[in-house]
Amino acid sequence: MTARPVGVAVVGAGPRGTAVLERLTANLGPSGPWADTPAEVHIVEPRTPGAGRVWDPGQPEQLLMNTVAGHATAFPDDTVRMAGPATTGPTLMEWARDHAPGAAPGLQPWEHPRRALMGRYLAWAHERITRSAAPYIRIVAHPTRAIGLDEAPEGRLRLRLDDGTALVVDAVVLATGHTDQRPAPREGELAAAARRHGLTHLPPGHPAEARLDLLQPGEPVLVRGLALNFFDQLTVLTSGRGGRFEQDGPAGRPRYLPSGREPRLLAGSGRGVPYLARPQVQGRMPTGHSLRFFDAAAVERLTAREPGTVGFMAEVWPLIVREAGAAWYRTLLEVRPGAARLPAAALLDRYAAAGDRTGVGTDPVAEHLYDPADRFDPFALDRPLEGRRFRDRAEFGAWLAERMYEDLDAARAPERSPLKAAAAAIAAVKGQVRRVVAAGVLSGSSYRELSWFRSFGAHIASGPPASRIAELAALYEAGVVEFMGARPAVTVDAAAGGFVAMSATTDGPPATARALLDAWLPGADLALSADPLLRGLVASGLARPHTAASNSGSGSGGGGGGGGIATGALDVCPSDLRVRDAAGRPHLRLFAFGVPVEGVHWNTAIGARARANAEMFRQADAIARSVLGATRVRPDSR
């Protein structure tokens, strides 16, 4: 037995940091391989442990999760294939029913619960994990930030905290989530111009932290972003200020009754349209999609390739298109068998036989459809305003409102919607894309294409609850929201004394306001990080940025040199998540998990899903076992 406890610091105690804590306590616990090993686990989290920044239990009660209650969990279950001891705990639904019966009475698995409720559940889960740890495991909470890390004697690490504490530990796990970013040059210039002219600019960031109180009732506000952050901030600015939605509008649509305290929002985004609604059927959980083309064998073929030799658009995208297109046409012909000149089985066979040609802009069955509008055209879905121009914002708004109502109809009857069938397929392939990315086989240029696909997939398959789209349409009808169009160019007009926005989507005068709300969350980019810990790691050489291999294979394929393309990630070994130093050497005792490694892994912000062999728990277990294995304590040393 060692003379002193094994020391581990976990930086960040949101869902991922909490998962690492749970896996550490399980592997150190009575049934684990490191049973009876004294340990001290330091949890560094300035916010509520378990909930972290995103799931703050004190955030506005109006904000909803974008996933359904039946999918949410903080604990592994018996579907999780991991080496460590099997443990379990209540899902969100089970917690609400058995441990907090008054927290969400009547909550159903298919409903989208409140984000604050999820935060309270995660905080409870963290407390339960802490309480149930074996008596020889000491868990110490540090309600502050980590600001620096360096080497200490005996191969240990010294973690410096913002309150002046210095922790000397055997291993550190970085689970920091979304940290603050410095503005990109163009955004910094816009913010500086706004300050010079006394304008209100709310920069991009976490929606619950935005100073929305600075936006005055009736004041015009330009808004950039129509994705998930937008819907959160829209809710706070409307129903959060006393407005009400009544379910007595035409065709059962909601009608908005303003409180008079709302600002007037003029919103636009890159696409110019909001994310599409998630399916939402009363009394039924969302149905999944069974993979046919982008299956395990396809993943195995791609991941067996040499680093940097797989082109995303040439080799991965065709598999995605085949999967989504087949789902589209299968549903189309189930709902409208007469839509094609061929029988359904023959058309689907022809589509499947086309192979990789489905991803290069040609549709192998288009000539057999009576109506060109029935084609599966992913690029048209991605650019819905391409080639369209409207006389003014009023004409565009009427068109967009009708589009939202059509999307709502599809979301409420997804089994009859080719679009929602394709969306389910796109959601299903994301796990396959994650495996390909983690293998390090994509070419450097593919990472730009991968960034595009992430945006496209989010727009199609990871949108808000359908109820939020219904509310947005009602807010448009009530005159609270107006739409500017695609790619609005925002500048500061010194003569006019305000922001000015122009979009090629609409003719007529530009949109003007003295306030600008950036309703989006910047992607993780190590080069722009404002986090002193991450920046210090790179500056000291303990860590390095990740670069992807170039098309010629001359890049690092998961490293930091050789002429590759920077992905914005902290460089780690894909398999065990050990941080690589400036020379590319994996550090034995420093690990990173989740958002900071977006680029080495993909879609890292996704949460754990119950009964789905969640990757988050598998990675947390692998990290915990590597941490314990890297110390001088071994399972056979007891």
List each language-model region with its residue ranges.
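Flavin (primarily FAD) cofactor-binding/catalytic cores of flavoenzymes
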Residues: 1-59, 103-631, 638
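Redox-cofactor-proximal catalytic regions of oxidoreductases
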Residues: 47-104, 587
